[in-house]
């Protein structure tokens, strides 16, 4: 949801990438549906490992983790000027599809709001 929010709700102020510490190997079906609804190219989405972005080939102004600290260890970024953590419970654990989709959509909008506030603070 972070990638979607950064790339669709911030008017180009941020470019979002997404990766997980334990990628599932596939995109959550509710997340795919949201991408479709907001007209985000599903081909740009992938279930990638954080290792892809944690080498010296990538450098970020902000690395924002959104993992559920109660259930998993959040990654540490050394190739970022700023590291932030916004904790969200993992919606993939929600069994009911409609409830999971609603939760993902809520997270999507919440991250977008936080990114826009962050941009205002940095300016």
What kind of feature is each model-predicted range?
Residues 1-123:
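Short polar/charged helix/loop
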């Amino acid at each position: 949801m972070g990638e979607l929010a950064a790339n669709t709700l911030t008017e180009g102020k941020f470019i979002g990438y997404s990766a997980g510490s334990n990628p599932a190997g596939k995109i959550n079906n509710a997340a795919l549906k949201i991408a479709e609804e907001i007209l985000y190219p599903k081909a740009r989405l992938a279930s990638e490992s954080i290792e892809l972005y944690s080498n010296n080939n990538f450098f970020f102004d902000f690395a924002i983790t959104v993992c559920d600290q109660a259930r998993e260890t959040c990654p540490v970024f050394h190739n970022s000027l700023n590291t932030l953590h916004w904790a969200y419970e993992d919606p993939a654990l929600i069994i009911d599809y409609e409830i999971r989709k609603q939760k993902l959509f809520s997270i999507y909008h919440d991250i977008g709001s936080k990114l826009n506030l962050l941009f205002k603070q940095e300016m």
